[in-house]
């Protein structure tokens, strides 16, 4: 099973800063198979945080989905949709992109079910061991996210010293819980530096 990213152009004047669950709900309403697709992931959106608790997306912002190739092709039907999120998120054209096997990968927010950093690292290491992946990692900034079940807490995480096969494997499977709300999705990182400054 080949896993890829789908990148969509987006336009949106403003979003709530804690948008993860709301974005998933909006996408699940537009893609009727997303809720049942266990391996699907939704990348965090990148923008500029404002003092009033909102997030502004620039022209280069992209909505990114991590999906199997089959689902990726079906997801392209999102183009032209307007999602009920913030001031309204307009989805433009989408492109399918292969995952790149960098030796160092980074996730903005990994959730292993605990807020204590030492326990977080222990659980992350155990999950990596179980998947046959190396446990070379550096934790960074603490994060929190609201969901209907309560607040999720976790940390950014960098994995390094990966072989090409290991890099693609961890990008395809993710780490921890909450891939559909932006957690545990790894992307290439060019060097082992300043993971806490993401």
Region spans (language model):
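RNA-interacting cores
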Residues: 1-198
